[in-house]
Amino acid sequence: KCGVSIPYKISPSTDCSSVK
């Protein structure tokens, strides 16, 4: 989802480009 933290990612950030 866009705008939420990404636990399965190295950095818990709102990666909108990664979660197209």
From Swiss-Prot:
Gene3D superfamilies in alphabetical order: Plant lipid-transfer and hydrophobic proteins
Function: Plant non-specific lipid-transfer proteins transfer phospholipids as well as galactolipids across membranes. May play a role in wax or cutin deposition in the cell walls of expanding epidermal cells and certain secretory tissues.
Record family assignment: Belongs to the plant LTP family.
Record-linked InterPro entries: Bifun_inhib/LTP/seed_sf
Identification of the protein by name: Non-specific lipid-transfer protein
Highest taxon of the lineage: Eukaryota
Keywords, in A-Z order: Allergen, Lipid-binding, Transport
A molecular-function term among this protein's GO annotations: lipid binding
Tissue: Leaf.
